[in-house]
Amino acid sequence: MSGKGLSPAPFNAQPMIVQDADPLRFRVGEQDPKTREFAAFIGDHRYFAAAAAAAAAANPHPHLEFRQNFYSEKPIIGNPNDSGGSDGEDDVDVEEEDEDDDLDGNEGDIGMNKDAGEDSVSAGAVIVVGQDNAAYYSQHFKTVEASFVSRNEESSIAADNGCDFSGRRDLSSSSSNSIESLRTILSDPTTGSLMADAMILPCGHTFGAGGIEQVKQMKACCTCSQPVSEDSITPNLTLRVAVQAFCREENSQSNHPSKRKREGFDQERRAFGVTNHSGRSRNKSNHFPFAVADRVIIKGNKRTPPRFVGREAVVTTQCLNGWYVVKTLDNAESVKLQYRSLAKAPEDPSAKATPNKMVSNWL
């Protein structure tokens, strides 16, 4: 193509001013207002709790419109922290939100949930920025809903346990009530006494001795008025065994508190320095089976000198903790032994004829 017929056009336009276009590269739309309110990111947009509250107030039933607009189930595309402003402004907003989270904790989640209404708990996917600047989905709200359901189930289980009372009751009261109810079941419906000699009728009702006497007089069951003959009355062995086991358990429970009470009383007496007189007399009879001037035979033990073993002696002194000082009769040698090393000497008629003054010469 030749350039013979071309001529340059006159340039009459105003000169252009060239500026740096880097700040304009990310500036799309108007700048978001700087605020400390808790915000939620849905897609590429950021919504504030105040705007959500205003929308909820304008629409009294935001189940469909508000949920479709605000709680859109569209997943995150791109960077959820990009609010349409510059990078520097985003950093400032993040720092301000972090400081606000440090002061208020998790109040933003609660406030947003409360402003959005009670129905927002079961809403769709919602992206919420927390303290660590991370996105949370609707599982957070479903967890809250699940916790409420679990609490309701727990309360229903606690209430519906067959006895119409909560499981968190005092153990002593529950055990006493169970014992009383079991006693009522095992008691004669006519006399109220335990059916240790239970007899069963053909109709299936069981009575004790007193109830059976009334049944024989009436010739009919006291409960269902069905005719009964004396030959058809048979012993209820199973119920008799149950009554015997109940009586044993009741006796053991009645004995245990008294034993614990007695042991606690003894501990208190020992703590205050008061000894038990019955125990002291019993220990005294065990530790001091001999008296002064009693004739004993030295049995000895592994620490007793062999020359004393088997010799006859007489008790001269009674010491503490069951110890005695005895003196042999043949050579008047004294030794201190415990009561376990001594035995009562057999009765000897010749020893009775010996005058007491002969023994007192060397004592």
Curated annotation (Swiss-Prot):
Keywords: Transferase, Ubl conjugation pathway. Pathway: Protein modification; protein ubiquitination. GO terms for biological process: protein ubiquitination. It is an enzyme of class 2 (transferase). It catalyses: S-ubiquitinyl-[E2 ubiquitin-conjugating enzyme]-L-cysteine + [acceptor protein]-L-lysine = [E2 ubiquitin-conjugating enzyme]-L-cysteine + N(6)-ubiquitinyl-[acceptor protein]-L-lysine. Residues 87-107 have a biased composition (Acidic residues). Residues 181-253 form the U-box domain. Residues 74-117, 343-363 are annotated as: Disordered. GO terms for molecular function: ubiquitin-protein transferase activity. Its EC number is 2.3.2.27. PANTHER family: U-BOX DOMAIN-CONTAINING PROTEIN 62, U-BOX DOMAIN-CONTAINING PROTEIN 62-RELATED. This is U-box domain-containing protein 62.
